[in-house]
Swiss-Prot record:
One of its GO terms (biological process) is cytoplasmic translation. Disulfide bonds: none annotated. Pfam families: Ribosomal_L23, Ribosomal_L23eN. GO terms for molecular function: RNA binding; rRNA binding; structural constituent of ribosome. Component of the large ribosomal subunit (LSU). Mature yeast ribosomes consist of a small (40S) and a large (60S) subunit. The 40S small subunit contains 1 molecule of ribosomal RNA (18S rRNA) and 33 different proteins (encoded by 57 genes). The large 60S subunit contains 3 rRNA molecules (25S, 5.8S and 5S rRNA) and 46 different proteins (encoded by 81 genes). uL23 is associated with the polypeptide exit tunnel. It comes from Saccharomyces cerevisiae (strain ATCC 204508 / S288c). It is found in: Cytoplasm. It comes from the Eukaryota. There is a cross-link at K61 (Glycyl lysine isopeptide (Lys-Gly) (interchain with G-Cter in SUMO)). Keywords: Cytoplasm, Isopeptide bond, Ribonucleoprotein, Ribosomal protein, RNA-binding, rRNA-binding, Ubl conjugation. Component of the ribosome, a large ribonucleoprotein complex responsible for the synthesis of proteins in the cell. The small ribosomal subunit (SSU) binds messenger RNAs (mRNAs) and translates the encoded message by selecting cognate aminoacyl-transfer RNA (tRNA) molecules. The large subunit (LSU) contains the ribosomal catalytic site termed the peptidyl transferase center (PTC), which catalyzes the formation of peptide bonds, thereby polymerizing the amino acids delivered by tRNAs into a polypeptide chain. InterPro entries: Nucleotide-bd_a/b_plait_sf, Ribosomal_uL23-like, Ribosomal_uL23/eL15/eS24_sf, Ribosomal_uL23_CS, Ribosomal_uL23_N. This is Large ribosomal subunit protein uL23. Belongs to the universal ribosomal protein uL23 family.
Length: 142
């Protein structure tokens, strides 16, 4: 009966021994870089703050007031766009979320600009299923 492949491989390994010659790795750079090691995610025993801070910029702080100038009214009538004065700290995502939350409408896009007097203005374009004129009436600035 012929020995199995596994047995012959084991025999060769025993004959060869464990002190074989290790192939040296060729280093191409003079700088030694430490290998990346496993970094586990932190699992703190307690929170670093006892009480989390309240929401600094809620929907009512994001949208300060609607702008009712003639040009803003033209945007409402012609472009399905509502115009608001918003907080300087608010970004487009926060403005979109605040309009959706306060006025129950879907927002297509938000354009913002910082005015020379130091306030931020937001042009909020509504989706086709909502009429900006109706929303402006509901808000009460027409």
């Amino acid at each position: 009966m012929a020995p199995s492949a596994k047995a012959t491989a084991a025999k060769k390994a025993v004959v060869k021994g464990t002190n074989g010659k290790k192939a040296l790795k060729v280093r191409t750079s003079a700088t030694f870089r430490l290998p990346k090691t496993l970094k586990l995610a932190r699992a703190p025993k307690y929170a670093s703050k006892a009480v989390p801070h309240y929401n600094r910029l809620d929907s009512y702080k994001v949208i300060e007031q609607p702008i009712t100038s003639e040009t803003a009214m033209k945007k409402v009538e012609d472009g399905n766009i509502l115009v608001f004065q918003v907080s300087m700290k608010a970004n487009k995502y926060q403005i979109k979320k605040a309009v959706k939350e306060l006025y129950e409408v879907d927002v297509l896009k938000v354009n913002t600009l910082v005015r020379p007097n130091g306030t931020k203005k937001a042009y909020v374009r509504l989706t086709a299923d909502y009429d900006a004129l109706d929303i402006a009436n509901r808000i009460g600035y027409i």
